[in-house]
């Protein structure tokens, strides 16, 4: 077979013969470089890629151009086209742009794109939380009871908690004036802060869907699919979209629950504070308090050791035998302060900031006290 192929290639005018002849001539004329020679050949940097000394450019660093990436060969024709007109975004100045959402006085449309990723559509959750059905309460009772018992076992039996002023929290949950909402605020050191901290409460509270708190949970962590969304929804968690400001359905729903006299728990830091630094509190809690039809009771709390119970590192396993300290502070008496803000018609963005600042001041004192109590246990 090989001889037949070679004889055919030797025929005059054969295309394969002409191609073979060209390849042989190219190899003979050293047009081909063996791989070993190519590897041994010394590397020479291209002239256009060599850096130019900065002394040739007396301007600032921002005015200098990167010659290595913008050098144009002299043989390339110049582009004589006129410059393109400016885009609409370039023609706008800062005075024509709308103010940020946190500084607006009216509730803007929630349909405005925010750039926040939405892994799962949560729009269907809010109507069910706003007007719960009888079926919702039945399922919620099972979920709340299961989570409450689990939290109590983990906190009270598997670890070593110490709660200061526990009766104060229980009294405000069960015996506050009818119709007056309760807003508890605390630091956020662990993903198990809620519901783990509520394991210190009696079973009559922690396993009662009518008495247990409403709480906001991150939409991109807790509400990522239908199953998780159902679980947290029946657990009285409200999906909050972090990064779109205080005017959103989660804050609106908290205000509605406050109008009904319910208990609402807020982590005003807005995230798990793994570094334990003093963060500026988010103003959403200020809006809930200021816009509530009835001024709520504001109860600050501080805890230490929850990040030891459930560390913020993999494999995220609940630990045993850890010391946890929960300190329930004094209720903040802001009634006169809030009434004065409303009487003077202080703009809502300013009012909610002033209220949040009051909570931040209470946090500083409560944190120092709780850290001291926690150190004394060790």
Swiss-Prot record:
Membrane topology: Peripheral membrane protein
Ranges of Basic and acidic residues composition bias in the record: 51-67
EC numbers for this chain: 2.3.1.-
Residue span of region Disordered: 46-112
Topology, Mitochondrial intermembrane side: 1-137, 159-378
Entry's Gene Ontology molecular function annotations: 1-acylglycerophosphocholine O-acyltransferase activity; acyltransferase activity; O-acyltransferase activity; phosphatidylcholine:cardiolipin O-linoleoyltransferase activity
GO biological process: cardiolipin acyl-chain remodeling; cardiolipin biosynthetic process; cardiolipin metabolic process; inner mitochondrial membrane organization; mitochondrial membrane organization; phospholipid metabolic process; sperm individualization
UniProt keyword list: Acyltransferase, Endoplasmic reticulum, Golgi apparatus, Lipid metabolism, Membrane, Mitochondrion, Mitochondrion inner membrane, Mitochondrion outer membrane, Phospholipid metabolism, Transferase
Biological function: Acyltransferase required to remodel newly synthesized phospholipid cardiolipin (1',3'-bis-[1,2-diacyl-sn-glycero-3-phospho]-glycerol or CL), a key component of the mitochondrial inner membrane, with tissue specific acyl chains necessary for adequate mitochondrial function. Its role in cellular physiology is to improve mitochondrial performance. CL is critical for the coassembly of lipids and proteins in mitochondrial membranes.
Remaining remarks: The enzyme was named after a masochistic character Tafazzi, once popular on Italian television, apparently due to the difficulty encountered for its identification and characterization.
Protein name: Tafazzin
Organism: Drosophila melanogaster (Fruit fly)
């Amino acid at each position: 077979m090989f001889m037949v192929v070679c004889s055919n290639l030797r025929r005059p005018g054969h295309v394969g013969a002409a191609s073979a002849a060209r390849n042989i001539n190219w190899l003979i004329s050293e047009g081909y470089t063996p791989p070993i020679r190519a590897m041994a050949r010394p590397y020479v940097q291209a002239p256009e890629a060599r850096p130019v000394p900065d002394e040739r450019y007396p301007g600032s660093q921002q005015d200098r151009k990167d010659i290595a990436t913008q050098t144009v060969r002299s043989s390339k024709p110049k582009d004589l086209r006129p410059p393109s007109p400016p885009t609409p975004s370039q023609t706008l100045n800062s005075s024509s742009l709308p103010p940020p959402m946190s500084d607006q006085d009216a509730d803007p449309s929630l349909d405005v794109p925010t750039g926040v990723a939405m892994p799962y559509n949560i729009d269907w959750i809010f109507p069910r939380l706003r007007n719960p059905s009888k079926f919702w309460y039945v399922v919620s009772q099972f979920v709340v009871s299961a989570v409450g018992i689990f939290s109590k076992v983990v906190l009270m039996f598997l670890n070593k908690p110490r709660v200061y002023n526990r009766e104060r929290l229980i009294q405000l949950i069960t015996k506050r004036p009818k119709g007056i909402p309760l807003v508890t605020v605390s630091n956020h050191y662990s993903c198990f802060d809620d519901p783990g901290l509520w394991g210190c409460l009696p079973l009559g509270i922690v396993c009662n869907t009518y008495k247990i708190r409403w709480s906001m949970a991150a939409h991109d962590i807790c509400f990522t699919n239908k199953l998780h969304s159902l679980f947290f929804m029946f657990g009285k968690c409200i999906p909050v979209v972090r990064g779109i400001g205080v005017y959103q359905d989660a804050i609106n729903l908290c205000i509605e629950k406050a109008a009904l006299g319910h208990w609402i728990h807020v982590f005003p830091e807005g995230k798990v504070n793994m570094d334990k630094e003093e963060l500026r509190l988010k103003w959403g809690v200020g809006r809930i308090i200021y816009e509530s039809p009835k001024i709520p009771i504001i109860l600050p709390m501080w805890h230490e050791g929850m990040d030891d119970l459930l560390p913020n590192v993999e494999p995220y396993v609940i630990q045993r035998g850890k010391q946890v300290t929960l300190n329930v502070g004094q209720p903040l008496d802001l009634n006169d302060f809030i009434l004065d803000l409303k009487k003077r018609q202080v703009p809502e963005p300013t009012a909610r900031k002033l209220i949040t600042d009051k909570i931040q001041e209470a946090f500083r004192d409560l944190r120092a006290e709780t850290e001291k109590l926690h150190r004394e246990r060790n």
